[in-house]
Amino acid sequence: VLGSVAMLLGFLFLYRETGTFDFIELAEKGRDVSPLIFCAVLAGLWVKVPLAPLHIWQAPAYAAAPTPVTMLLTGVMSKMGVYGFLRIIVPIFPEQLKQHAGTLMAFALLTILWGAFLALRQTDLKRLLTFSSLNHVAYCVLGVGALGIAADGLKVDAHALATQGIILQMFAHGLAAAGLFYLVGLLEERTGLRGRNDFGGLSAVTPRFAAVFFILTFCSLGLPFMAGFAAEFLIFSGTFAVAPGVTVAATLGLLATAVFLLTMLQRVFTGPVNEQYKSMPDLTRNEILILTPIIILIFWAGIYPTTWLEFSQKLTQMIP
């Protein structure tokens, strides 16, 4: 709520100074508005993404929400914050973004590493995936910081790569994270539990469930031939051109992500079968129908990324 209030106040004062809500006119006049307006809009988006340290609402909200709501929050709502950076901050406040790009990248890096650290400590699968989401979406904001540095026109390739990477990462993570939360919801519905250490050997009991869970997790890990790989490769290519040190540091987040996600797979699906869950039902036909489009899109965007990059390039050209 506070983030929405800050953003609303920022928009109201932006109108007061410019006399318009038209994006084209704002792109011309936004360079000269009060820094407080930029800070208000930035604060609202900071909460919505979210970025550390304004992320404290996310884990309790995601953990307490019903599965469909959590899927909506991670698949759509968090991406609206990133969309706000691309659609509002980048075109309307380019000078302010350029001035504060380093700070934005620093907080994005902090969120990447802090999100991974928090995920490593979780045993509740829903909270673990929440902090994984915090970690992954921060890569998008890292790319936004790169756009600010590249906005002087000297890094045109970096600007295009980072923008396309951000768009593809929103798409890829939205699919994988929503699918994983759906599967954890099914697990909780079948067993009444969602602890990482409550299970074991489920791959032998529910092979279809395990196969889909592995695919979605590997997409989150950024394995080749999946959408997550193409997205992260583009973001890192764009950020490395303007901030190589920060980019190298951000790869530590990838290593930590591999640790907590692979540990999750090992604890839940491998080892001896828990006798309590030997009769646990596998995915039903309807559940497979829900998950199949997600899997198809993940591999499509990973194997044929040009299909999506041609589309996102048109969007990229609309952003100054």
Description of each model-found segment:
Residues 1, 75, 105, 129-133, ...:
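Residue-level recognition of transmembrane alpha-helices
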Residues 1-13, 67-83, 133-146, 206-213, ...:
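Small-residue-rich segments of transmembrane alpha-helices in multi-pass membrane proteins
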Residues 4-55, 60, 82-103, 146-164, ...:
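Juxtamembrane/interfacial segments at transmembrane-helix boundaries in multi-pass membrane proteins
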Residues 49-63, 113-132, 185-188:
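C-terminal ends of transmembrane helices
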Residues 52, 177-183, 247-279:
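Predominantly late transmembrane helices and immediately cytosolic-facing juxtamembrane segments
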Residues 57, 67-72, 128-129, 165-166, ...:
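Alpha-helical transmembrane segments and their helix-entry boundary regions
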Residues 68-69, 102, 126, 163-164, ...:
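Residues that define the loop-to-transmembrane-helix transition and helix capping
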